[in-house]
Amino acid sequence: MHPVLCGLAANPALPAELIDRLIAVADTAVDSALALRPDLSHVQMVALASRADDTAVQLAYVGRLTAPDVDPVAQPRAALALLDKRSGRPEWARLFAMDPAVEHREKLAACPGLPPDVVETLAADPDVRVVAELALWTTADMAARLASHPHAEVRRALAANEATPPAVLAMLVTGEGLPPAERCLVCDREATPFVHDQECSLTDCDLPPGASCDGSHESTVHDMQLAALRNPATPAGAVVGFADHPSMLLREQLAARSDLPPEVAGRLVDDPDAGVRGELAENPSIGDAQIRALAADHGYDVRRRLAHNPRVPLDVLDQLAAEIRISSHPLPRIAAASPAEVEEMARSKNPALRMVLAERRDLPNGIRDALALDPDAKVVKSIARHPGLSEAQLRAMVDRHRVRVIAKVAANPDASAALLEDLAGHEPPGHKVFREIARHRNATAPSLLACLASRDARSLAAGHPALPPHVMVELLSHDDWQVAEAAASNPSLPPAVMSELVPGR
């Protein structure tokens, strides 16, 4: 990979004639960067696609190649990508359905809208991987037909397909109405009973760690049950019995279901595994009784996840905010709070609750301004990025709380160039402040030059258009490839310098 050429390939100011020269000399990494450019001509896109299959696939998926641009024999992966986007030709599907390469048939099986005869061919494919891939993506009618397939891997894939009819999903879970599966990937390869080594060292082995079969295909059945529990189309009545299953993974997925009956949720509140209770805590379908019981849970992570439940009552959230460390992202319950609830939280005596409220970016001006004057630095850090704060308010925050808030102040979209320059020279320097300055639209040359001294911010500063051009040129030869690439991608890089960097003049 050539970082400077990769940077130039992504540079929005790169002249059209240099794009042509770059295409002629590009490697795979540069091709990928060029393929993302919105200003490529059709001729340039076709030229790029002809150089590397990966690039052709990339261009096909973003809709920049069409069927006339692709030869399915020379570029099979690009043709399959177009089929996956419903932009390929039906005859291609028939060609790939008979392709000796299993990976091509498997990819085809995942494509939507295939001709019926192609679907029938794939359903009868001799390789179970192809049939399983079809089962994962096929329509309800074919899913119902494949439910009695003798291979457990096909049934596992059907259990994950949301188009599989609910009645069929129930049969897959309970086994009622279906003949027993005859084979699985484990007993296809090994004499049973067999348990695959968790630390298998064979490089050509693709069995999952711990995969096992004693004749009942137990690990595949477990995976099928797990897929069915994750599938919202599976009827709740078919899976409630997993509340007492010995598998923690199955109970976790049951606890996360949006159609969980209240009586089952009540049983899972007392589950011995904290992971199960944590899934339940985040589930917006649980009732007030379960929420309040989980608020008293001894598991820290259970209470943390409960705080992210969009239906948690504010009095419970008040309690949780005082007990646990909550992420800086707005909580769903806070985001959904009514105007009256917002006012109530802004007056809370609990600074942790005021802090999570301050993470919102749509607060009324009066509440925003009141939180900007909060005596608690945690609250001020949260509100500092809120749009609409004046320069005087931002400077007052820094005067009161100093290094504890300067990175958040620097992240405010309305921070002025003068304020950013002052923050860049603040003593002591704040953690992360240089990264925030380097990515800020209002940053000027003096503050960006200060950012270059920070290893964490250097590459961001190198790509900022306000950096002096002579500094960009110096950074093109920097030891850190990310810095050199960022400098080359800078739209303020002089065109003459760009031309010198691209071979083929």
Question: PLM features: what roles do these ranges have?
Answer:
Residues 1-505:
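Alpha-helical scaffold segments
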